[in-house]
Amino acid sequence: MHLELASCKSMKGVSIMNDQRIFDMELVKVESLENAVRTPFYQTDSTGGSVWVIKPGQTLPKHYHHNSDDIWVILQGKGVFYPTPDTEVTFTKGQVIVSKKGECHGAKNTGTEDVIFVSIVAPVPADYDPVSTN
């Protein structure tokens, strides 16, 4: 599965290297018909913020961050969250999902509208270790 990382140029004029402290997710988010897309909008030496867009049927593959916590604030949509490689838990807008360092996480959009969530990761940089699909 391929994940897309939006470039700063595609974020409609938003840059993660400025002093901005309020962000409009409608201006930050980037979409793709092919893959889930993560668009970074904020980073310091200790914390990073990104907005994810997962279209209906798309998956954010199961993975780990061995040294970072990852907190998701669900702004729109519904789907399933993978707290372990073999477990699915439903989620919907308005919920917060917390994955501590070393815990499996991933998601699939099972609804009819885009899943949009903000991810806050700390500390950064965060490693990305995909769950093997033996």
Where are these regions (language model features)?
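A short beta-strand-loop-beta hairpin characteristic of the jelly-roll/cupin
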Residues: D69-K93, E103
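Ligand-binding loop in jelly-roll beta-barrel domains
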Residues: K101-D127
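A short, N-terminal "cap"/entry segment at the start of jelly-roll beta-barrel domains
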Residues: H2-G48, P61, V98, P130-N134
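Conserved short histidine dyad/triad with adjacent acidic residue
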Residues: S50-H65
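Short strand-connecting beta-turns/loops that link adjacent beta-strands
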Residues: D45-S46, N67, D86, T112-E113
